[in-house]
């Protein structure tokens, strides 16, 4: 009943339940239907009475009363007159709130064009009329006439006439023979007279006939807009306005300031200009003013309306009194301060507070300390309610007084209220979901919030003055979600990689590490202890120390839960830690019977979580934290200057390196090496010296020393302890303190040749200090840029992935990805086990030896399976992936696999897209901003030899080797690899060996660890012959294409190929070497081509004409330096480049087909390369390659699809087009992982896959069939599949398309939801497009729902949606049943009523 009474007083309709929102162009009738009256005067309020002027911009008669239930003149007051319209002032008596809802309108004396449809590119009006924007503007702004009806004259339709031409035409043909108009009326006429169906049909015919690409594109664009208008029911002439709507006055308020001035919204100024000009125009028309004056006024009106809708889009920006541009309606929506991002996506909330945080080591993991004052303020409503319930107060006023006086009973009640009521803590910047967590508050004195030390990692908080915000979840549902989902105890694992995030750090690690150290010759060595009691006794009496080697008995339980014990060699410190381990058969003592570095502690917590569950883990973490702090305090580890050790050999190493650099300097002066080579060698030498000194220093720090007096082991070096345990500091920092600072970089990124030889302990010289300032300043500038860039990357990622939600359990996909271990420089960086853990197997995984099934198809791969897989040495596994998931909207749980933050299969409704975006974006701030500029050597080859990293047997993949005249094995293949297999035949290491390397091993040899496998010259790239014969030169003309340079010091001459194209005489030359037999015939290569080797500029000739060469001999060398120093984009810019799918600057050229390489006729400054396919049905493919680029293919080489013709970073689009989706996915995943791996950041592959899935959602139509699309359209992949299914059923022709890769920004703007796209970027463009097409937003994603103010369709909201769907389906069934049983209409009506009520 109550609700009904309240509804009487509520002027709004009940909150409608709706499923979608549509946007379209407003027709004049529509605008009038919204309006409550016309605004005729520009006045706002009367400056004396402060009452709104009648018919003005704030008119109470049109917009509603100023005070609740009171008319303007004060005749009718209070509720009883509700709904009456006062006869004196014409104001309706109602709530003043209607001034936020009621709109007005302005009738324009002349039509004006809507600037969005005119100027937002591509101009919709322009495309529709097939005129250029310039021409339309000439007509609109009264410069030219346009012919609308040519009649029988020689004029053409849409022809523009200047004033003079118009006069001449009138004289020539007479005024009534043709119609030419000017201004918006002209455009209105043209648009109103368009027959869209006919135009669409004509365009389709033209499209079918045209052959030129450009024309086709133009026609397609026009056809698209015409079809949009036809489908949406919009009329073209609505893009010209005759009526301007006026938004409600409370959305553009006029606020009195003190001192009698007013602050007003800019919109009021803009509306005033429109009204003034409109009224003036009306008056001029009534007065029959001269045409030129009226025209000028019309133009000014058009400009005023333009400024109102989008100020600054055309012409000068209209500024206010203080020279600041006025904010137009468009600006209200745009950007960070616009309606979408400021008020709809993020709002300020009440019941929140913020304060400084301090550490709370005595808290439990699920608690936080809340200052009493703060809690009192935050929980006020709850306290009032409780005071009332307990009878301490009868009114709110009384309760308020009690609370203000802070009476003792208030504190008791506060305690009750707070008990079991979680609060949310948030630290800005909230980069991932662990930046907001729920805690149970405990009341504390003081004014700072206490935070548990273990959650600092998740919040990225420290206690140097950080602040945190507290929010109170009010409703029961909110409290429930906070407790079940957001409690800190429920967030033990990191969503990005599944490793524990509640891990001790800094002091705690140091304490635990100290506790676990073993020392030699301590008192009591070799004693045996039966239990902890004895041990404690011995420790207290100093019979043993924490580090003594002892034997101790560790008690745990077996699988049945019966106590068992076992004796271990350990130390008292480790026994103390072992005492805290949960008693479980799967948690052995060995897990903490080792040096507890941060990594090992993390592994231990992970192990406990996997085997003992969440509750045990939380208790264990709390205990281990207490233990760590206690022993860090007891140990008292600190360091002074003497703890930084400078190695004795430093001076010697520095002297040796200086001698080397002097030698290089000499070689350069003698002309033996170039400037670049000298630079590379010097930088290399100093780099090696720094490393050597660091090694020596670390060896000194690690060394175990004994005290000569007591004979006991000396205390370990504390700097080393801190670094080695992972508590603080790194080898790099220790090197700078005690070794040598080493090489520094210039601001441009190049390395300065002179290093800093001193360290901080010795102190820097003035010059050294100056050199080091570059880096320091650049570091600061980088950090500032990085934060903004990283935040923007996260925002784009969230936007593209926000609608990837787990929406079903299994999509039944039969395709997936192949996972293999990632190998980098022979080292396995990511093992196959790490990569497949927590993913669903696509095919059964079989044991390679026994053939038994390890994991069945469709089961998730767990830790225990990974152990078996790793032992069995399986090298590739097919798994399900979000990329290949076939779910219509969202992703299915099977394809996604494990929810990393819980360690269980993912739940339905989990917003995996947002989690992926946060996991990738959050570490963004740790990535570097810099582009590496590396010298030739440093980038091309890091070393000049390869050593075996494992023992085993050698196998050569793609073996292609020959023995040269020195009897060495030489690699002739371009993609050959050396594999090292262990005894079981499992690949332990894979090394790529480059063309021209010398091999020291062959197939089947056994190698020891550290044995040399191959070596090569790092500074040159060889050109070798494959056949034995005699050398002959072609086109190597002295002075033109070859020059001899003599070395002054040695007198040795070398012949170098010079740029022959620089002289006119040499333009046709093709410098090459050919190998002939004795008879002088050119020899053939194994692949069929001639033995002719083309030489590029700067090649150094290694043989003389007529020399006899054997296969594998080098005939020329190309200095690596000429493979100009490349910039390697690294860090954040590289990640952004990959996600935006940009083409890299010097991108690789990839072969599109298998075939043979042939050299075609050269182009001006490009080489033409043709690939002749092995298969005759395919056309040959041509590539043009810039001539000076280093290029390693020879005529006649056989090339495979996907091989690189020109090295560089490949463009992702090429990979997609040539090798397909799977290759693209693995390329993007590996490249992005590479960047993060360098920084030591772990991110699970599936997150990157989810984002790549969102980038691959569109296909480009190639064959339209009967789909109604136009070739070149971008359509959702799933949408096309649905349409095709329907067409096949109807027996029509389906369409087909190729997948397209869109960058994340593009993909976000192309989401089906226009609300989401508009709130992302380019708001006006998105809304214009959506309005023309009459787009429908079905509110599928998260952002749209947040904006319209509903629960998001993920998590708990996802469940509600599902239940609602089931309920509606049931209701329909019931209605159908009833309809069948009772034919009576009344029953049906009643039922419909019932159902509606139920739905509400």
UniProtKB/Swiss-Prot annotation:
Catalytic activity: RNA(n) + a ribonucleoside 5'-triphosphate = RNA(n+1) + diphosphate
InterPro entries assigned: DNA-dir_RpoC_beta_prime, DNA-dir_RpoC_beta_prime_bact, RNA_pol_asu, RNA_pol_N, RNA_pol_Rpb1_1, RNA_pol_Rpb1_3, RNA_pol_Rpb1_3_sf, RNA_pol_Rpb1_4
GO MF terms, alphabetically ordered: DNA binding; DNA-directed RNA polymerase activity; magnesium ion binding; zinc ion binding
Cofactor: Mg(2+); Zn(2+)
Amino acids binding Zn(2+) 2: 811, 885, 892, 895
CDD domains xrefs: RNAP_beta'_C, RNAP_beta'_N
GO cellular component terms, A-Z: DNA-directed RNA polymerase complex
Entry EC number(s): 2.7.7.6
Main EC class the enzyme belongs to: transferase
Magnesium listed as a keyword: yes
SUPFAM superfamilies assigned: beta and beta-prime subunits of DNA dependent RNA-polymerase
Top-level lineage group: Bacteria
Residues noted as binding Mg(2+) in the record, renumbered to the chain: 462, 464, 466
Gene3D superfamilies noted in UniProt: 1.10.132.30, 1.10.150.390, 1.10.1790.20, 1.10.40.90, 2.40.40.20, 2.40.50.100, RNA polymerase II, clamp domain, RNA polymerase Rpb1, domain 3
Note on how the cofactor is bound: Binds 1 Mg(2+) ion per subunit. Binds 2 Zn(2+) ions per subunit.
One GO term (biological process): DNA-templated transcription
Residues annotated as binding Zn(2+) 1: 71, 73, 86, 89
UniProt keyword annotations, A-Z: DNA-directed RNA polymerase, Magnesium, Metal-binding, Nucleotidyltransferase, Transcription, Transferase, Zinc
Quaternary structure note: The RNAP catalytic core consists of 2 alpha, 1 beta, 1 beta' and 1 omega subunit. When a sigma factor is associated with the core the holoenzyme is formed, which can initiate transcription.
Family: Belongs to the RNA polymerase beta' chain family.
Role of this protein: DNA-dependent RNA polymerase catalyzes the transcription of DNA into RNA using the four ribonucleoside triphosphates as substrates.
Name the UniProt record assigns to this protein: DNA-directed RNA polymerase subunit beta'
């Amino acid at each position: 009943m109550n609700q009904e009474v309240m509804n009487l007083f509520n002027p709004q309709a009940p909150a409608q339940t709706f499923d979608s929102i549509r946007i379209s162009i407003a027709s004049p009738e529509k605008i009038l239907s919204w309006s409550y009256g016309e605004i005729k005067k520009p006045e706002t309020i009367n400056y004396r009475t402060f009452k709104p002027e009648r018919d003005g911009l704030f008119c109470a008669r049109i917009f509603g009363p100023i005070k609740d239930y009171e008319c303007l003149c004060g005749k009718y007051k209070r509720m009883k007159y509700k709904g009456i319209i006062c006869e004196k002032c014409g104001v309706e008596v109602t709530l003043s709130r209607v001034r936020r809802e009621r709109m007005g309108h302005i009738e324009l004396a002349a039509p004006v064009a809507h600037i969005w449809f005119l100027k937002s590119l591509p101009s919709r009006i322009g495309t529709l009329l097939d005129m250029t924007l310039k021409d339309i503007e000439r007509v609109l702004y009264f410069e030219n006439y346009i012919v609308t009806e040519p009649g029988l004259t020689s004029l053409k339709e849409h022809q523009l006439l200047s004033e003079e031409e118009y006069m001449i035409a009138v004289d020539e043909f007479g005024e009534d023979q043709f119609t030419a108009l000017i201004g918006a009326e002209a455009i209105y006429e043209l648009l109103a007279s368009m027959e869209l169906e006919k135009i669409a049909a004509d365009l389709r015919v033209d499209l079918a006939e045209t052959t030129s690409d450009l024309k086709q594109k133009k026609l397609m664009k026009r056809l698209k807009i015409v079809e949009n208008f036809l489908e949406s029911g919009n009329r073209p002439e609505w893009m010209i306005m005759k009526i301007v709507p006026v938004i409600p006055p409370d959305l553009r308020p006029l606020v009195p300031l003190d001192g009698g001035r007013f602050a007003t919204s800019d919109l009021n100024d803009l509306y005033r200009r429109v009204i003034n000009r409109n009224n003036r125009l009306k008056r001029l028309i009534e007065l029959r003013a001269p045409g030129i004056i009226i025209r000028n006024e019309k133009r000014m009106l058009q400009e005023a309306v333009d400024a109102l809708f989008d100020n600054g889009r055309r012409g000068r920006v209209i500024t206010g009194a203080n020279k600041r541009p006025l904010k137009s309606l468009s600006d209200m929506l745009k950007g960070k301060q616009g309606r979408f991002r400021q008020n709809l996506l993020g709002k300020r909330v009440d019941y929140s507070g913020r304060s400084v945080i301090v550490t709370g080591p005595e808290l439990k993991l699920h608690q936080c300390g809340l200052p009493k004052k703060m809690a009192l303020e935050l929980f006020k409503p709850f306290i009032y309610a409780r005071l009332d319930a307990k009878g301490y107060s009868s009114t709110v006023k009384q309760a308020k007084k009690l609370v203000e006086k802070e009476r003792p009973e208030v504190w008791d009640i506060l305690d009750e209220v707070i008990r079991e009521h979680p609060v949310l803590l948030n630290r800005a910047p909230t980069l991932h979901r662990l930046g907001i967590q729920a805690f149970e508050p405990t009341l504390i004195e003081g004014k700072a919030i206490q935070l548990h030390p273990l959650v600092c990692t998740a919040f990225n908080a420290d206690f140097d003055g950080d602040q945190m915000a507290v929010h109170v979840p009010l409703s029961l549902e909110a409290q429930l979600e906070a407790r079940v989902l957001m409690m800190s105890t429920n967030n033990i694992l990191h969503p990005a990689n599944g490793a524990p995030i509640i891990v001790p750090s800094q002091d705690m690690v140091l304490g635990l590490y100290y506790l676990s150290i073993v020392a030699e010759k301590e008192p009591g060595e070799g004693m045996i202890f039966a239990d902890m009691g004895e041990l404690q006794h011995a420790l207290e009496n100093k019979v043993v120390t924490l580090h003594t080697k002892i034997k101790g008995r560790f008690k745990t339980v077996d699988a049945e839960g019966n106590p068992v014990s076992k004796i271990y060699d350990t130390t008292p410190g480790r026994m103390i830690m072992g005492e805290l381990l949960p008693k479980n058969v799967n948690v052995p003592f060995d897990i903490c019977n080792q040096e507890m570095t941060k990594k090992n502690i993390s592994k231990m917590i992970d192990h406990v979580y996997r085997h003992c569950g969440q509750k045990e883990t939380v208790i264990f973490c709390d205990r281990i934290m207490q233990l760590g702090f206690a022993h860090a305090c007891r140990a008292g580890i600190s360091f002074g200057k003497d703890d930084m050790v400078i190695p004795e050999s430093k001076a010697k190493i520095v002297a040796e390196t200086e001698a080397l650099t002097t030698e290089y300097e000499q070689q350069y002066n003698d002309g033996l090496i170039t400037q670049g080579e000298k630079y590379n060698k010097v930088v290399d030498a100093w780099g090696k010296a720094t490393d050597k000194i660091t090694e020596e220093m670390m060896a000194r720090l690690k060394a175990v020393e004994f005290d000569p007096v007591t004979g006991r082991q000396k205390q370990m070096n504390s700097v080393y302890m801190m670094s080695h345990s992972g508590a603080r500091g790194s080898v790099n920092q220790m090197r700078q303190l005690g070794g040598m600072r080493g090489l520094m970089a210039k601001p441009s990124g190049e390395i300065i040749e002179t290093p800093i030889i001193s360290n901080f302990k010795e102190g820097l010289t003035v010059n050294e200090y100056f050199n080091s300032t570059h880096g320091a300043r650049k570091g600061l500038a980088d950090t500032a840029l990085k934060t903004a860039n990283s935040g923007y990357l996260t925002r784009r990622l969230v936007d593209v992935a926000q609608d990837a939600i787990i929406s079903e359990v299994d999509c039944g996909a039969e395709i997936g990805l192949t996972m293999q271990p990632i190998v980098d420089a022979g080292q396995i960086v990511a093992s196959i086990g790490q990569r497949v853990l927590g993913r669903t197997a696509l095919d059964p995984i079989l044991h390679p030896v026994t053939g038994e099934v390890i994991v069945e198809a469709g089961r998730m791969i767990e830790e225990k399976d990974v152990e078996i897989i790793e032992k069995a040495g399986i090298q590739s596994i097919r798994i399900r992936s979000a990329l290949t998931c076939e779910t219509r909207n969202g992703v299915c749980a099977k394809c996604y696999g494990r929810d990393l933050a819980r360690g269980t299969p993912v739940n339905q409704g989990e917003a995996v897209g947002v989690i992926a975006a946060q996991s990738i974006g959050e570490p963004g701030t740790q990535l570097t901003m810099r582009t590496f500029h590396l010298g030739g050597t440093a980038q091309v080859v890091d070393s000049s030899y390869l050593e075996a990293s494992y023992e085993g047997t050698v196998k050569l993949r793609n073996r292609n080797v020959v023995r040269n005249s020195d009897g060495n094995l030489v690699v002739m293949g371009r993609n050959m690899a050396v594999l090292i297999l262990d005894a079981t035949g499992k690949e332990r290491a894979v090394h790529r060996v480059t063309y021209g390397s010398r091999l020291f091993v062959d197939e089947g040899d056994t190698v020891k660890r550290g044995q040399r496998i191959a070596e090569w010259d790092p500074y040159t790239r060889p050109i070798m012959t494959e056949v034995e014969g005699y050398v002959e030169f072609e086109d190597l003309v002295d002075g033109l294409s070859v020059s001899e340079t003599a070395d002054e010091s040695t007198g040795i001459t070398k012949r170098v190929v010079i740029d022959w194209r620089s002289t006119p005489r040499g333009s046709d030359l093709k410098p090459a070497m050919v190998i002939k037999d004795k008879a002088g015939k050119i020899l053939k290569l194994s692949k069929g081509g001639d033995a002719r080797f083309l030489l590029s500029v700067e090649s150094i000739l290694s043989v003389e004409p007529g020399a006899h060469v054997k296969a594998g001999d080098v005939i020329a060398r190309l200095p690596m330096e000429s493979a100009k120093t490349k910039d390697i984009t690294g860090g954040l810019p590289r990640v952004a480049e990959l996600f935006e799918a940009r083409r890299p600057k010097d991108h690789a050229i990839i072969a599109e087909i298998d075939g043979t390489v042939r050299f075609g006729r050269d182009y001006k400054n490009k080489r033409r390369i043709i690939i002749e396919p092995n298969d005759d049905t395919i056309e040959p493919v041509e590539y043009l390659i810039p001539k000076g680029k280093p290029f390693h293919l020879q005529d006649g080489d056989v090339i495979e699809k996907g091989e690189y013709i020109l090295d560089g970073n490949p463009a992702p689009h090429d990979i997609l087009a040539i090798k397909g989706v799977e290759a693209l996915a693995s390329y993007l995943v590996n490249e992005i992982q590479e960047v993060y791996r360098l920084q030591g950041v772990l991110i699970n592959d599936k997150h990157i896959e989810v984002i790549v899935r969102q980038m691959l959602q569109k296909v480009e139509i190639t064959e339209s069939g009967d789909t109604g699309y136009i070739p070149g359209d971008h359509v959702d992949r799933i949408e096309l599949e649905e349409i095709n299914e329907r067409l096949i059923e109807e027996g029509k022709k389906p369409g087909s398309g190729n997948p397209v890769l869109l960058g994340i920004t593009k993909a976000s703007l192309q989401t089906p939801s226009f609300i989401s796209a508009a709130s992302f970027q380019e708001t006006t463009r998105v809304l214009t497009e959506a309005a023309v097409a009459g787009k429908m937003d079905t509110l599928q994603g998260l952002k749209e729902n947040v904006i319209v103010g509903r629960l998001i369709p993920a998590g708990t909201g996802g469940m509600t949606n599902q239940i609602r769907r089931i309920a509606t389906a049931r209701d329909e069934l019931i209605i159908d049943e009833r309809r069948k049983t009772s034919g009576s209409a009344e029953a049906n009506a009643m039922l419909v009523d019932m159902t509606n009520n139920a739905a509400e």
